[in-house]
Amino acid sequence: AKQSLLSVRGLFININKGVIISWLIAYVVMGAAYGSIYGDMQTFLESNEMMKQMFSHTGFSIEESFTGTVMMVLIGLVSILPIAIVNKLFSEERRLHLSQIYATKVTRSQLYWTSIGLSILSGLLGVLLAAGSLGGTAISAMGNSGEMDIVDFFAAGFNLFPTVLFFIGLAALALGWAPKLGKIVYIYLTFSFLLNYFSGLIDLPEWFLNTAIQSWMPQMPMDDFEASVFLTVTIISIALIVIGFLGYSRRDMNEGA
């Protein structure tokens, strides 16, 4: 066996390598695609009344309004990869691919936390690449007319990182207590994304909007950073991950299920 496969970390990276690389490339491409619009933003929005309604906010430049919404879209996409990595642990378990590992001194704790660690790292990389690609392309497209710099784009992206952690927490909770429900996390992600994306077009009650985790977060650069919200969502996410671990360390393995 390759040296890289002799550790749990190396094995997990190898198992997820293809999907990680594919998604990271997709984030760069999507960021660049949205970023290229910044050079001709006014024309782009005036050509479509619905887009204008979605991306225009009173008191803010078109670029700032657009960035707040587009970053939410990109970070929603970034959340898919960490969920897939956490769910992969169960699919490997179900296919009996982990049987030999269970027979060694490797503990469930190592398997769980390696999977969680890899999902968090992939989420961080995803935000970095998506925000960097969007910002770099946007600044290039705007030239000297732009009011935003690369720091604004990274701040807007990493401000939403707790939502990525929250989806990791939900996937971890499912993995630990009801692993066959892991796919439902994708449904909630889609629901949250659509609710936020179209919230400017549809008049929905506040309580309903707040069922989407993204609604809890300020939309930078239009809104100011809120440390209390950032920490609250992060702590809730960590709690979900820990509760997931308690279930995973106790439940029966679903080998061949």
Residue ranges and their predicted role:
Residues A1-V8, S47-M54, H97-R108:
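Juxtamembrane inter-helical linkers in multi-pass membrane proteins
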Residues S65-L89:
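Long, hydrophobic alpha-helical segments
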Residues L160-L194:
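A structural motif at transmembrane helix-loop-helix junctions in multipass membrane proteins
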Residues T114-A171, T234:
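Secretory targeting signals
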Residues T107-I120, F225:
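Membrane-interface alpha-helices at helix entry/exit sites of multi-pass transporters
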Residues A1-Y27:
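Aromatic- and glycine-rich beta-strand/loop motifs that create alpha-glucan
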Residues A1, A33-H57, I184-A257:
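Terminal transmembrane helical anchor/hairpin motif
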Residues I83-Y102:
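Transmembrane helix boundary and interhelical loop/hinge segments in multi-pass membrane proteins
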